[in-house]
Amino acid sequence: ADNRRPIWVMGHMVNSLAQIDEFVNLGANSIETDVSFDRNCQVLVVFDLKTGHRWQFGGITNKVLNEAAYK
């Protein structure tokens, strides 16, 4: 039996779609980001509790995020 586990190369604290592309191009096979959704499942913000920084992701839908996941 093959008991090997995958190695995760994670893009950490990704805060824009451009950064997603950047990390994927650098070899990341997973992305860590914080998102919030409104009642219509629209992405509202990315928020870093440690620094207090807040980024707006206006107009990005679940469809866009799902498409980014399958590039």
From Swiss-Prot:
InterPro entries: PLC-like_Pdiesterase_TIM-brl. It is an enzyme of class 4 (lyase). This is Dermonecrotic toxin LgSicTox-alphaI-Loxn-A. Contains 2 disulfide bonds. GO terms for biological process: killing of cells of another organism; lipid catabolic process. Its cofactor is Mg(2+). Belongs to the arthropod phospholipase D family. Class II subfamily. Mg(2+) binds at E32, D34, D48. The active site is at H12. It comes from the Eukaryota. GO terms for molecular function: lyase activity; metal ion binding; phosphoric diester hydrolase activity; toxin activity.
